[in-house]
């Protein structure tokens, strides 16, 4: 016999440590610690001992007893299938009315395992002495549980051919409680007398008590969907053809809320026990880890909550408006901004692919982001809640204060000789001065080139040299994981012998010693802080270049993407307003990106500030000083909108849901994902454990080159599908085509997915205007693939689902061709991560003499993964075959301790491909930890 404490996963949220430390009940053997050692379908008995008086979290123990011997003692030997038999009087919870099993569960367990079957048993089931003994033993070991009422649940795991979700609730007598001594078996009819009934039953032994119990049995391996009966006050829903279901509690919260590949290995019991007006509610989740798991049903789409939709900034009419007249639509969006000189034409596409938007208009970007909000009377509104990495290092800056800082910086830059059209390199951590520097440049018509502060001196040098920057703005150092690291040192190396650089402006951030070059180097506080707060912004042409942002190129030389003023700000402001449904008067928005990337430019600086929003800017890493840091920040500022990357979401998944569960995240009302396609499991985990099971998620697709979001759900309109970017935003035109440019048609969900190329077939306001100094490279890179049609080639593979929604699969070089089948690395990675034992996965294609390309996978396992590496590899191959196709089974699966990632969190698949094909590694300078390849090679 084994005894253990199980904690509730819902309110009251008692942790296992809380319960066990309070009552000194220690498991000698964890139940099902080795599920492979037990017969797969053998029943077990769980006896839940709760104290007679409901008490708060941590004071009421929950003892779980499992015993193979006890289970065998309660297995019927001469009774019909499905009858729960015992040897002493008890009250079965499923007796009449609501207690009827609905629908019946049909089991294919052979009679030799269940005993002979004939007829129907009615009358009084009996509890065996071994059951009573086990209960007494368990309860006696929990001192606070002595004299408790013991609720027994006999559960038999159904074989693969059965698929059901059953609800068991007690019959209620006139007094509202079942009788302890008069109980009946579940009613049956002549028509179903021969049908095997569920072995699930609930018995209440002891004092009368009202008991509500829900259990979701696993559906079949064939994914036949099942209907869950609904108890009063609860609801259930299923996804078409996906073999998934959700059973919700009385509070309409999913009991099964993570992905099907996790839930398929779990049995969840949600129990509410009431005495008079007082109720105790708890959920118990029991891992079964079956060797051939099937999939639970979960919704395939998640519509927005009714109250969210009713108050959303964007409605479905926005699509119709844009469809009716696309240019008139963009004209209306541009007029949300303040133009010193109105534009005369919306678009000039005569020199395609070089676009001109809002022709003739003049605008100042910084004025639109700062001054106009102050002039509108919102100067006291907080623009930035800045949180430094060292705990306690924080400050809040209002729009009026931000305006003063930007004006001072603009005056200082003017004094240094900068004029419109010059370039400034910004190499800084996430501190307010970085945003001030960007806005000061925009105010002057000076192009800023922000370089991620994690890049090396050589990478910085290449960008300074290409842009011919006159000024570099940096800081003495930055904080990373609690330590101060130098930045000025890298700048000194990068600007050595650079004739274009006249000055280096340095912010004091960490106080570390730095080398100093007199005549070139200047302290920010001595230069900017002394300048005047009065500055009149000049208006610039709509096509005035706003910034350069370098992105990686296939040739190895970074591409300087050029974005201009009017079109970029129009789309940045429009998408931020509608995709994130921002309410400037009440929202606190947080985008976790770095300003060194385009997400930081558009959705930290220009989008939020143009809309007058209050936002959080955080300097440090998500796990410094602890893995709770992000959630502490959300709590501290009452963040309502949270926009982050799938990489970080998967990091949180590996840390465990108990981390976000220990914080009050109820302020969150919208979540966003950016940077790469998000796998459905991470999407559902994100919604359930960070969004409280209710927040809409906007999965956004866009690029450095597009400047702003292009494909995304509208949160108040779209029933979002986990893993899908859904449809182009109003005003955006995108399609998926084959090699010849023919548009693909929506395919059946269960059929083999047909992958095509994602293209943009109409110009858009925030589109890049070129590659700095290389117009031919601009044409060759983005417009030559479908030059005849005049389409922008995004470089991403994508597919349509049966509803015509877009699923972006990643870079086209991440689409493998295996025996003529085009298979996305993202699809295979999603299938692998869907396994309950996998924390993270990366997939690449490697050359293969037979199939052209073969699939190679690199997998990080969870600490809780069962079985040895060889067994796990076979399980994962089978998982991919089941989820996608046998043709997609990886040729190689390597279990590794870590994956190679850049400082922006992206997996370097190019280097994994080098490993898979046995080549020497390419450049590893952008990796966080190049030494990870030693462990990866050791795994081969």
UniProtKB/Swiss-Prot annotation:
Residue list for modification N6-acetyllysine: 906
One BP annotation, GO: acetyl-CoA biosynthetic process from acetate
Residue segments, region Disordered: 70-127, 157-202, 224-274
Catalytic activity: acetate + ATP + CoA = acetyl-CoA + AMP + diphosphate
Cofactor: Mg(2+)
Top-level taxon: Bacteria
Signal peptide positions on this chain: 1-33
Posttranslational mods: Acetylated on Lys-906 by Pat in the presence of acetyl-CoA as an acetyl donor and ATP. Acetylation results in the inactivation of the enzyme. Deacetylation by the SIR2-homolog deacetylase CobB is required to activate the enzyme.
Binding-site residues for CoA, renumbered to this chain: 480-483, 599, 819
InterPro entries xrefs: Ac_CoA_lig (IPR011904), ACAS_N (IPR032387), AMP-bd_C (IPR025110), AMP-bd_C_sf (IPR045851), AMP-binding_CS (IPR020845), AMP-dep_synth/lig_dom (IPR000873), ANL_N_sf (IPR042099)
The entry's keywords: Acetylation, ATP-binding, Ligase, Magnesium, Metal-binding, Nucleotide-binding, Signal
GO cellular component terms given for this protein: cytosol
PROSITE patterns according to UniProt: AMP_BINDING
Amino-acid positions noted as binding Mg(2+) in the UniProt annotation, renumbered to this chain: 833, 835, 838
Compositionally biased intervals (Low complexity): 184-202, 224-245
Positions with a binding annotation for ATP: 675-677, 699-704, 796, 811, 822
CDD domains, per database record: ACS (cd05966)
NCBIfam families, A to Z: Ac_CoA_lig_AcsA (TIGR02188), PRK00174.1 (NF001208)
Entry's family note: Belongs to the ATP-dependent AMP-binding enzyme family.
Full protein name: Acetyl-coenzyme A synthetase
Source organism: Mycolicibacterium smegmatis (strain ATCC 700084 / mc(2)155) (Mycobacterium smegmatis)
């Amino acid at each position: 016999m084994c005894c253990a404490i199980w904690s509730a996963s819902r309110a009251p949220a008692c942790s296992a440590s809380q319960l066990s430390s309070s009552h000194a009940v220690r498991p000698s053997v964890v139940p099902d610690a080795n599920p492979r050692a037990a017969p797969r379908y053998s029943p077990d008995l769980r006896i839940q001992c709760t104290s007679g008086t409901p008490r708060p979290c941590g004071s009421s123990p929950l003892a779980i007893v499992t015993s193979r011997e006890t289970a065998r003692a309660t297995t019927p030997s001469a009774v019909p299938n499905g009858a729960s038999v015992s040897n002493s009087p008890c009250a079965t919870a499923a007796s009449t009315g609501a207690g009827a099993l609905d629908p019946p569960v049909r089991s294919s367990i052979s009679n030799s395992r269940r005993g002979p079957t004939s007829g129907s048993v009615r009358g009084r089931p009996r509890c065996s002495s071994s059951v009573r003994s086990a209960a007494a033993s368990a309860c006696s070991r929990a001192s606070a549980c002595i004299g408790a009422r013991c609720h027994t649940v006999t559960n038999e795991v159904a074989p693969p051919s059965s698929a059901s979700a059953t609800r068991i609730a007690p019959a209620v007598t006139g007094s509202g409680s079942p009788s302890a001594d008069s109980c009946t078996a579940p009613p049956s009819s002549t028509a179903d007398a021969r049908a095997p009934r569920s072995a699930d039953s609930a018995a209440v032994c002891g004092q009368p008590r009202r008991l509500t119990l829900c259990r979701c049995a696993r559906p079949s391996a064939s994914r036949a969907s099942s209907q869950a009966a609904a108890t009063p006050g609860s609801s259930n829903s299923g996804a078409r053809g996906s073999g998934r279901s959700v059973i919700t509690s009385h509070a309409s919260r999913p009991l099964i809320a993570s992905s099907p590949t996790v839930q398929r290995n779990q049995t969840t019991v949600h129990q509410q026990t009431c005495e008079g007006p007082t109720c105790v509610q708890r959920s118990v989740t029991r891992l079964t880890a079956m060797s051939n798991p099937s999939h639970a049903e979960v919704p395939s789409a998640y519509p927005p909550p009714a109250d969210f939709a009713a108050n959303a900034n964007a409605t479905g009419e926005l699509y119709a408006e844009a469809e009716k007249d696309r240019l008139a639509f963009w004209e209306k969006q541009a007029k949300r901004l303040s133009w010193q000189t109105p534009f005369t034409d919306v678009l000039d596409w005569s020199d395609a692919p070089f676009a001109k938007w809002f022709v003739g208009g003049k605008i100042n970007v910084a004025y639109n982001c700062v001054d106009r909000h102050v002039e509108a009377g919102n100067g006291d509104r907080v623009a930035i809640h800045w949180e430094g990495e060292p705990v306690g290092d924080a400050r809040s800056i209002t729009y009026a204060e931000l305006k003063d800082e930007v004006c001072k910086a603009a005056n200082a830059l003017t004094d240094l000789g900068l004029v419109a059209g010059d370039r400034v390199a910004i190499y800084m951590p996430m501190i307010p001065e970085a945003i001030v520097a960007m806005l000061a440049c925009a105010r002057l018509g000076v192009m800023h080139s922000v370089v991620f502060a994690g890049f090396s001196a050589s990478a910085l040098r290449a960008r300074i040299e290409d842009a011919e920057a006159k000024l570099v703005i940096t800081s003495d150092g930055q904080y990373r994981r609690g330590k101060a690291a130098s930045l000025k040192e890298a700048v000194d190396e990068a600007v050595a012998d650079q004739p274009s650089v006249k000055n280096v402006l340095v912010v004091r951030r960490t106080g570390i010693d730095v080398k100093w070059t007199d005549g070139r180097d200047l302290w920010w506080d001595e230069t900017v802080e002394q300048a005047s707060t009065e500055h009149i912004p000049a208006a610039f042409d709509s096509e005035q270049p706003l910034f350069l942002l370098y992105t990686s190129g296939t040739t190895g030389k970074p591409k300087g993407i050029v974005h201009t003023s009017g079109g970029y700000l129009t789309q940045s402001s429009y998408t931020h307003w509608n995709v994130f449904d921002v309410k400037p008067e009440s929202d606190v928005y947080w985008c976790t990106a770095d300003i060194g990337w385009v997400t930081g430019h558009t959705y930290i600086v220009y989008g939020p500030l143009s809309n007058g929003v209050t936002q959080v800017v955080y300097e440090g890493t998500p796990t410094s000083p602890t893995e709770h840091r992000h959630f502490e920040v959300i709590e501290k500022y009452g963040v309502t909108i949270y926009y982050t990357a799938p990489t970080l979401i998967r990091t949180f998944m590996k840390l465990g849901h108990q981390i976000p569960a220990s914080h009050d995240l109820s302020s969150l009302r919208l979540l966003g994902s950016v940077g790469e396609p998000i796998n459905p499991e991470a999407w559902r985990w994100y919604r359930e454990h960070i969004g409280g099971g209710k927040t809409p998620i906007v999965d956004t697709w866009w690029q450095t080159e597009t400047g702003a979001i292009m494909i995304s759900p509208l949160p108040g309109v779209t029933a979002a599908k986990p893993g899908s970017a859904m449809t182009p935003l109003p005003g955006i035109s995108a399609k998926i085509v084959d090699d010849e440019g023919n548009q693909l048609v929506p395919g059946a969900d269960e059929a083999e997915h047909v992958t095509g190329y994602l293209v943009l077939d109409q110009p858009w306001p925030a589109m890049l205007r070129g590659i700095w100094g290389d117009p031919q490279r601009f044409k060759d890179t983005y417009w030559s693939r479908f030059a005849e049609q005049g389409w922008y080639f995004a470089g991403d593979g994508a597919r349509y689902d049966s509803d015509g929604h877009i699923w972006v699969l990643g870079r086209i070089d991440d689409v493998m061709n295996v025996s003529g089948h085009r298979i996305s690395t993202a699809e295979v990675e999603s299938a692998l991560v869907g396994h309950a034992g996998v924390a993270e996965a990366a997939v690449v294609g490697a050359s293969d003499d037979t199939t052209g390309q073969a699939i190679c996978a690199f997998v990080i396992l969870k600490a809780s993964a069962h079985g040895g590496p060889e067994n796990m590899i076979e399980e994962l191959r089978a998982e991919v075959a089941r989820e996608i196709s046998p043709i997609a089974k990886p040729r190689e699966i390597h279990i590794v301790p870590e994956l190679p990632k850049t400082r922006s969190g992206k997996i370097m698949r190019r280097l994994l491909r080098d490993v898979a094909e046995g080549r020497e590694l390419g450049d590893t300078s952008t990796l966080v930890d190049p030494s990870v390849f030693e462990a990866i090679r050791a795994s081969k």
